[in-house]
Amino acid sequence: MLDIAMPKIEVVTAAENYGRFKIEPLDPGYGHTLGNALRRVLLSSIPGAAITKIKIDGVFHEFSTISGIKEDVTEIVLNIKGVRLRSYAERPVKISLSKRGSGIVRAADIDAPSNVEIVNPFHYICTIDRDDAMLEMEMTVERGRGYLPADQRDALPIGEIPIDAIFTPVPKVNYVVENIRVGQATDFDSLLIEIWTDGTIKPGDALSHAAQVLVQYSQTIADFNRLSTETESTAAPNGLAIPADIYDTPIEELDLSTRTYNCLKRADITKVGQVLEMDEKALLSVRNLGQKSMEEIRDKLIERGYIPRIGQTTNSSPAGIES
């Protein structure tokens, strides 16, 4: 394979929510190849956090009005979408807002736990225009990628209002490709990429993350020949095979209780296959995981068909846990 000259990266401008980066020299054509790929990943695949649903005391749907509040619920929902935050929690987190008396309500009035940080505290939410009025609101913060419309969410209980979730922390990316001279050649590329963020991530970190995403996909293709010759299943201690797609399923898919989930995570058990490899004795040896949690795990595995139900026999059950 012919060697490809590695480019250098120069930070032209660096701020909290804006950055310009120059990548050069690139072989002819690679400016647009890299620029377009990085731009697409930056706009769609950088993880972020957003408020996904709200619940306001005395409000049952988004077309309501609130006594003593200048804005109607639809306007409040639109303003809530603009609250930008960092979430360090893997699971949904509840935050709340409680304010009494006339005045402007801003994002700074939101009461959030230590694992959630409001990045734009001066963001306007609504105005209370009566001294005896009160606004009580509960919001759910989740992590995700891209954009999740409210109408693609599962049905919520009456009173909970879904919000279009804008997870992406990168709203805008531009790139320009120019020709530069390298030795006697004048057709090499120089890539200048501009990145705007919402302040929850630095532009340089976003660029690095986007490149890592591209590397992961490219590595899968690069390893194709090696992976195609390897076995597609892993053997459990009981001698039964665990298909690769089941083995690599995240334990989040089991929808376990918070206590059980945290016990497994602290033990560095992150995949369904790891659970299936363990017998009951091994599971019970996990710190703080008791009989009740073990039974919950077994029920979830049965529910999803990973192990057979009692009385059902199969020669291909992948589980190490007996049912």
From Swiss-Prot:
Residues 243-323 are annotated as: Alpha C-terminal domain (alpha-CTD). One of its GO terms (molecular function) is protein dimerization activity. Its EC number is 2.7.7.6. Residues 1-225 are annotated as: Alpha N-terminal domain (alpha-NTD). One of its GO terms (biological process) is DNA-templated transcription. It catalyses: RNA(n) + a ribonucleoside 5'-triphosphate = RNA(n+1) + diphosphate. The keyword RNA-binding does not apply. Keywords: DNA-directed RNA polymerase, Nucleotidyltransferase, Transcription, Transferase. It comes from the Bacteria. It is an enzyme of class 2 (transferase). HAMAP family: RNApol_bact_RpoA. DNA-dependent RNA polymerase catalyzes the transcription of DNA into RNA using the four ribonucleoside triphosphates as substrates. The N-terminal domain is essential for RNAP assembly and basal transcription, whereas the C-terminal domain is involved in interaction with transcriptional regulators and with upstream promoter elements. Belongs to the RNA polymerase alpha chain family. This is DNA-directed RNA polymerase subunit alpha. It comes from Roseiflexus castenholzii (strain DSM 13941 / HLO8). The lineage of its organism: Bacteria, Bacillati, Chloroflexota, Chloroflexia, Chloroflexales.
